[in-house]
Design a protein with these regions (language model features):
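Extended, hydrophilic extramembrane loops/domains of integral membrane proteins
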Residues: 108, 112-118, 131-182
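Internal alpha-helical transmembrane segments
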Residues: 1-49
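Juxtamembrane/interface motifs at transmembrane-helix termini
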Residues: 35, 53, 179-181
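N-terminal membrane-entry
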Residues: 186-187
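Alpha-helical structural motif
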Residues: 5, 100, 104, 169-173
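Charged, low-complexity surface segments at secondary-structure and domain boundaries
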Residues: 27, 88-94, 161-163
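Short, charged N-terminal helix-start/capping segments
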Residues: 17-21, 25, 124-134, 176
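Membrane-proximal low-complexity regions enriched in glycine and acidic/polar residues
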Residues: 41-142
Length: 187
């Protein structure tokens, strides 16, 4: 009777430990350079077609990552950035005000960005201001609060917004999985 109990315990512990280790393996690989970048991200990239009538740049969100520190969610990295200069978009920086870091920071606060978030300044003539708060960059502990907003550098209009609710199913799973893997979920 004792030996059967130990065998059963060993099998149960082994099964559940294997499940946890498999979860860590899959969530870790989802943002690794080769497996994540070549296989996972193309499956779960945010569809830029959701941004109606917004001209897109040749640059992707991955270009916003500097020195290996991500500032946008992994599900957006392969998605093209919007391009400034078209005059489209929703009201952002009030008319008559210059579009600069100060007015974009005020807009971020008005849009509900509180606490830690990033504002990326445009790097090219068609570049955009990008306001983001997400778990990949350590801004948030809850991936369901991930949010990225793009602002036209000339007009101050909001060109595009991507939030967790807009992500495809696999991008949602990747965002939650990475936060879980890093121990950030819920902090």
């Amino acid at each position: 009777k004792g030996r059967l109990w130990w065998r059963s315990l060993h099998a149960s512990v082994g099964f559940w430990l294997s499940a946890v280790l498999l979860m860590f393996l899959l969530t870790g690989l989802s943002w690794a350079g080769i497996w994540g970048g070549k296989f996972v991200q193309p499956w779960n990239s945010f569809p830029a077609a959701k941004w109606d009538a917004v001209p897109l740049s040749d640059a992707t969100h991955a270009t916003l990552t500097a020195a290996g520190q991500p500032v946008v969610p992994g599900g957006l990295e392969k998605t093209p950035l919007p391009a400034s200069g078209s005059g489209v978009g929703a009201v952002g920086v009030p008319a008559g005000q210059p579009v600069n870091l100060d007015t974009v920071a005020a807009l971020a606060k008005q849009l509900g960005f509180a606490g830690q978030h990033h504002i990326q300044v445009p790097q090219t003539a068609t570049g955009v201001f990008t306001i983001s708060a997400d778990t990949m960059s350590g801004d948030l502990g809850n991936p369901t609060q991930d949010r990225t907003v793009h602002v036209d550098r000339y007009s101050g209009r909001v060109l595009a917004e991507a939030a967790f609710a807009d992500y495809p199913l696999l991008a949602k799973a990747m965002a939650v999985g990475i936060a879980l893997h890093q121990g950030d979920l819920g902090l």
